[in-house]
UniProtKB/Swiss-Prot annotation:
It comes from Rhodopseudomonas palustris (strain ATCC BAA-98 / CGA009). The chain crosses the membrane at residues 4-24, 30-50. InterPro entries: DUF1328. Keywords: Cell membrane, Membrane, Transmembrane, Transmembrane helix. This is UPF0391 membrane protein RPA3505. It is a multi-pass membrane protein.
Length: 57
């Protein structure tokens, strides 16, 4: 699951860079939402993995 979160985080970062850079002005709000959701999911998955003691990514 952590692998999927990292994948979506990378996609959100790319979308955020395009959105914040003014290239895709209409998608700025969507990129912001996806970016923050991906960060939250990444942090939750990382914390759960740490507490379970698994080192899989």
């Amino acid at each position: 699951m952590l692998g999927w979160v990292v994948t979506f985080l990378v996609v959100a970062l790319i979308a955020g860079l395009l959105g914040f850079g003014g290239i895709a002005g209409a998608s700025i709000e969507i990129a912001k939402i996806i970016f923050f959701i991906a960060i939250v999911l990444f942090l939750v998955s990382a914390v759960i993995s740490i507490f379970r003691g698994r080192t899989r990514v």
